[in-house]
Design a protein with these regions (language model features):
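Long, contiguous binding/interaction regions
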Residues: 1-174
Length: 175
């Protein structure tokens, strides 16, 4: 079971059909795969590269879907709202906002691909288990780790970090 990284993403695009495509993909739990597909097994295109084969954790991204996704997406699983790890999208005019969980880390490589495809991308993320958070806007990542009370106040409030760490501080004071 992974540590879950909480993510908030807002995208814009001049082409309404690109937002339609993103929203449909997100509702179908096939968001990243739609815009940044994982390579297929050359001998069986119905399978992902290395699917079903055992792999070494030190292998490169050319031999397994797992390594490829970590290198290119920034996380190992796709995102969406159908599986229960994301909320329904909110759309107003040319802007779409989603809130979702990803495994271990935010999908920063996916965000980079969206920018290449003409999206304006603004995101924030928080992983309470490893105590890191950040904001990402069109390629600029502001990353913070360590004590959450040293994070920017807007980020602390956005993810209500007091809910995650407040009880720990009370326990520390008792010791």
């Amino acid at each position: 079971m992974p540590n879950w990284c909480m993510n908030k993403l807002t995208i814009r695009h001049d082409d309404k059909s690109m937002l339609d495509k993103f929203e449909k993909a997100y509702r179908d739990d096939w968001t990243i795969e739609t815009f940044y597909p994982t390579p297929r097994d050359p001998n069986d295109p119905t399978k992902l590269i290395g699917e079903g084969a055992s792999f070494d954790i030190n292998e490169g991204p050319d031999t397994s879907w797992y390594h490829w996704r970590l290198k290119n997406w920034g996380t190992k699983w796709d995102i969406g709202c159908k599986d229960g790890y994301g909320l329904e999208p909110t759309r107003v005019d040319d802007e779409l906002s989603i809130t979702f969980d990803s495994a271990w880390s935010p999908p920063l490589g996916f965000y980079e691909r969206l920018v290449v495809l003409g999206f304006d991308v603004q995101a924030s993320y928080f992983e309470p288990g490893m105590s890191f958070a950040g904001t990402w806007h069109n390629g600029k990542d502001n990353y913070y780790e360590g004590n959450w009370s040293d994070f920017p106040e807007a980020l602390v409030d956005e993810f209500d970090m007091h809910e995650f760490y407040g009880d720990l501080e009370v326990e520390d004071e008792k010791m």
